[in-house]
Regions:
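ATP-binding Walker
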Residues: 15
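Conserved phosphate-donor/acceptor-positioning beta-strand/loop module used by diverse small-molecule
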Residues: 97-98, 110-131
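Switch I (effector-binding) loop of TRAFAC-class P-loop GTPase G-domains
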Residues: 29-45
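P-loop (Walker A) phosphate-binding loop of NTP-binding proteins
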Residues: 12
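A conserved segment at the C-terminal end of the G1
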Residues: 18-31
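Conserved nucleotide-sensing/catalytic segment adjacent to the nucleotide-binding pocket
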Residues: 40-100
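NTP-dependent small-molecule kinase module
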Residues: 153-183
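Hydrophobic anchor at the beta1->P-loop junction of P-loop NTPases
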Residues: 9
Length: 183
């Protein structure tokens, strides 16, 4: 089994996944940008960590939401390359969140090649957060995301951890929990 870790963070829209990941950018620097085909991300040498996705200040929809809809094959190739080179180089850990890569296919690929840890964020403030950010995600889309998360939970069969993300204190605790995987 691989010694490098891949941390996947999922949850319904507006639970605070992107806000949680932004804590890494606020607390560590520098971050170098990288690109592998259609897969973009940020690398921090001190944490030995790659965060997948595109994060820009002030964007509501950042992270893997900013990647191409056709990024999945490049993600899978990237995971294979990471596994292949692990024997020769001290490789990096990988962290991602969001709908684009948080799917069964990506999770299955990750768990066959790396030490996978899955966190699911939940919040009782999802409805008010949708209003606060003025998003226009349809009820059909939101129900589809709920179904997707439920299917992933069923597949993982309790091999995930739920993180409540209702307050600033929760955000800090969740950040420290995820950070502890890398330090």
């Amino acid at each position: 089994m691989s010694t490098t870790k891949i941390i996947a963070i999922g949850g319904e829209p507006a639970v605070g996944k992107t806000t949680l990941i932004r804590q890494f950018f606020s607390n560590y620097s520098p971050w170098l940008r990288f690109k592998y085909k259609k897969l973009y991300g940020h690398y921090n040498k001190k944490l030995h960590l790659v965060i997948l996705g595109v994060y820009s200040a002030k964007e509501v929809f950042s992270g893997t939401d900013r990647l191409s809809m056709s990024v999945q094959p490049d993600f899978e190739e990237f995971i294979d390359i990471n596994k292949k080179w692990e024997k020769h180089n001290p490789n990096y850990n990988i962290l991602f969140e969001g709908d684009r890569l948080f799917n069964l296919k990506a999770i299955k690929k990750a768990e066959t090649n790396m030490n996978l840890k899955v966190y699911l964020l939940e919040s009782k403030y999802v409805d008010s957060r949708h209003k606060d950010r003025n998003d226009n995600q349809s009820e059909k889309f939101l129900k589809g995301r709920q179904t997707k998360i439920n299917n992933i939970k069923e597949y993982l069969n309790d091999r995930y951890e739920i993180l409540v993300n209702d307050s600033d204190a929760d955000l800090k605790r969740n950040y420290n929990k995820i950070l502890s995987n890398f330090i």
